[in-house]
UniProtKB/Swiss-Prot annotation:
Coiled-coil portions: none
Superkingdom to which the source organism belongs: Bacteria
One term under GO cellular component: cytosol
Function description: Located at the top of the head of the 30S subunit, it contacts several helices of the 16S rRNA. In the 70S ribosome it contacts the 23S rRNA (bridge B1a) and protein L5 of the 50S subunit (bridge B1b), connecting the 2 subunits; these bridges are implicated in subunit movement. Contacts the tRNAs in the A and P-sites.
Family: Belongs to the universal ribosomal protein uS13 family.
Keyword rRNA-binding recorded: yes
InterPro entries attached to this UniProt entry: Rbsml_uS13_C, Ribosomal_uS13, Ribosomal_uS13-like_H2TH, Ribosomal_uS13_bac-type, Ribosomal_uS13_CS
An example molecular function term from Gene Ontology annotations: tRNA binding
Any one Pfam family match given in the protein's UniProt record, by short name: Ribosomal_S13
Region (Disordered): 91-118
Name of the protein in its database record: Small ribosomal subunit protein uS13
NCBIfam families: uS13_bact
A biological-process GO annotation: translation
Length: 118
């Protein structure tokens, strides 16, 4: 198991797909990382040399990933709620934030239906 950014990368997968198991790295960024490290994206992670894995580690360390990114996103949401802006109020009430309709849909965000008490 190769360990990059505190995450165990599955060794039986291609380099690009394995890098996407890190929170904050998608396919495009994984391809950019492989290109800048001069690593073939189709090579499986178990076939990489230790120095190639080390270059991947240093390249991934340049980005905000995993715990730091999660903390940053949660702090952004908390800031919106503290400001009391529209988006913050929608987060606080557990409603859709980006203008979706709520009369008939949004069950995932609103939770299960609550019966009306007479």
């Amino acid at each position: 198991m190769a360990r990059i950014a505190g995450v165990n990368i599955p060794v039986h997968k291609h380099t690009v797909i394995g890098l996407t198991s890190i929170y904050g790295i998608g396919k495009t960024r994984a391809q950019q990382i492989c290109q800048s490290c001069k690593v073939d994206p189709t090579v499986k992670i178990k076939d990489l040399s230790e120095e190639q894995i080390e270059t991947l580690r240093t390249e991934v360390a340049k980005f905000t990933v995993e715990g730091d990114l999660r903390r940053e996103v949660s702090m952004d949401i908390k800031r919106l709620m503290d400001l009391g802006c529209f988006r913050g109020r929608r987060h606080r009430r557990s409603l859709p934030v980006r203008g979706q309709r709520t009369k008939t849909n949004a069950r995932t965000r609103k939770g299960p239906r609550k019966p009306i008490k007479a």
